[in-house]
């Protein structure tokens, strides 16, 4: 028998009963599955904890087949007892210490970042302190440990407030016991917590490889935002593509005041948002209406890969934003060179344009303030802002095919159009008034 005990405090995962604060962001079944992912990660983590392991579970019918299947043999199982969460934790600690253990630490399971080193540190610290408590970033606590069962810290009236940690620490010290604040972690209770975990994963291989990380990546919510203005010739074809290949994504069309039948042609199965005219304004309005973790800005004259949602998710495992790159629906030599230059600029210089299918972490989009609402060059300004902040786009394996409608004509007319587009960008880089450039560009958006 080890001198130390570690209690994993959880419940039997049941759809509609567990992680309910994540609904409707996740379905009841997904809430159950992410809870199972937490338990898988805790099983693996607990193998490196220098203590005997106890799993205290809650179950409405007393049965715990999922918990048992995940943790297997080698741990001791007990059903939680008590009238509320505080008394249940106290009774678990009291029961385990009554078995003769010198010290005991208890944690919940919705802290997928928790490391075994932190649990061992808490147990080690009980050699010198009466109690240890680990704060969560939302003001609660994820860990509590004791050498003797003290009931007062568990008599709180409210366990869902931002003062739980402080009230618990006050209760311990008011009784004359010594207490150490140990490592702070963030838990996962809300969709915001999911998004913060997603961003943390991109720089932490351990989190990406965890069962929780793999689940979150595979179920990342993608919002497809399509700004439209007089697109009756293209909007039906894009909807056909999206109905086929975006079944698990949110699709939002943002109409900037079309004077043709564009808005009427948009299927009620997609969300239609009205906004002022201007692509930047429309995309920002779409982002405000979106619920996804990842925002994908798509032009209406695009042809997208069948598996574009999975390609976005794959890139976003390691990157905060990315793009598809572009190819054109023309074999014209000058369009081929345009493709090469555009993709080189996106991936080597970090300046993707809008027709290359930019997608971005929602939190990062909000952090930089979205698109600057200028009449033209909003994509250049957006990418430049990200590059200045140190962000470079990730690259998908496939390309978006975009229309060459702006380049119609004979070869010399294509060259003239290419030159005009280059000159517009050059003027913008050199500080010419963007409104003057927009007048030269013409009213095509």
Model feature map: region roles:
Residues 86-92, 274-290:
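Glycine-rich, basic loop-to-helix element that forms the pyrophosphate-binding segment
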Residues 132-138, 321-333, 342-360:
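A recurrent flexible, glycine/aromatic-enriched loop bordering the glycosyltransferase active site
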Residues 104, 295:
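Short aromatic/hydrophobic "clamp" motif used to bind/position activated sugar donors
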Residues 14-46, 230-244:
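Short, well-formed alpha-helical segments that are part of the catalytic scaffolds
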Residues 125-132, 306-334:
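Conserved donor NDP-sugar-binding/catalytic core segment of glycosyltransferases
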Residues 202-220, 384-445:
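Hydrophobic helical membrane-anchoring modules
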Residues 60-63, 255-263, 302-303:
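A conserved acidic beta->alpha catalytic loop
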Residues 109-122, 261, 300-314, 384:
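Acidic donor-binding/catalytic loop of UDP-sugar-dependent glycosyltransferases
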């Amino acid at each position: 028998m080890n001198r130390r005990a570690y209690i994993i405090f959880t419940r039997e995962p049941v759809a509609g009963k567990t992680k309910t604060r994540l609904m409707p962001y996740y379905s009841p079944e997904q809430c159950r599955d992410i809870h199972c992912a937490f338990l898988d990660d805790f099983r693996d983590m607990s193998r490196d904890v220098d203590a005997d392991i106890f799993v205290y579970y809650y179950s409405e019918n007393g049965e715990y087949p999922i918990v048992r299947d995940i943790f297997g043999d080698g741990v001791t199982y007990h059903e939680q007892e008590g009238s509320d969460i505080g008394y249940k934790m106290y009774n678990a600690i009291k029961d385990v210490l009554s078995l003769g253990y010198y010290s005991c630490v208890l944690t919940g399971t919705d802290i997928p970042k928790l490391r075994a080193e932190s649990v061992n540190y808490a147990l080690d610290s009980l050699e010198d302190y009466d109690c240890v408590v680990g704060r969560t970033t939302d003001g609660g606590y994820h860990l509590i440990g004791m050498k003797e069962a003290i009931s007062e810290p568990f008599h709180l009236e409210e366990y869902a407030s931002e003062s739980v940690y402080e009230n618990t620490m006050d209760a311990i010290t008011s009784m004359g016991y010594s207490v150490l604040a140990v490592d702070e972690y963030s838990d996962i209770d809300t969709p915001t917590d999911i998004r913060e975990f997603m961003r943390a994963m991109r720089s932490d291989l351990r989190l990406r490889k965890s069962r929780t990380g793999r689940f979150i990546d595979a179920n990342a919510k993608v919002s497809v935002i399509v700004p439209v203005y007089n697109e009756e010739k293209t909007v039906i074809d894009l909807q056909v593509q999206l109905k086929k290949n975006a079944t698990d994504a949110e699709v939002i069309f943002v109409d900037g005041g079309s004077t043709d039948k564009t808005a009427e042609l948009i299927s009620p199965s997609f969300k239609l948002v009205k906004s002022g005219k201007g692509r930047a304004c429309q995309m920002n309005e779409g982002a405000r209406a979106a619920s996804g973790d990842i925002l994908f800005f798509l032009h209406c004259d695009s042809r997208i890969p069948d598996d574009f949602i999975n390609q976005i998710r794959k890139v976003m495992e390691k990157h905060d934003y990315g793009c598809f790159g572009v190819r054109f629906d023309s074999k014209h030599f000058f369009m081929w060179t345009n493709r090469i230059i555009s993709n080189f600029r996106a991936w080597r210089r970090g300046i993707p344009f809008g027709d290359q299918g930019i997608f971005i972490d929602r939190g990062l989009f909000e952090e930089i303030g979205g698109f600057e609402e200028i009449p033209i060059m909003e994509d250049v300004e957006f990418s430049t802002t990200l590059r200045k902040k140190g962000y470079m786009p990730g690259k998908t394996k496939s390309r978006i095919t975009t229309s060459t409608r702006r380049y119609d004509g004979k070869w010399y007319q294509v060259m003239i159009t290419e030159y005009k587009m280059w000159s517009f960008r050059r003027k913008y880089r050199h500080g010419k008034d963007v409104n003057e450039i927009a007048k030269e560009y013409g009213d095509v958006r």
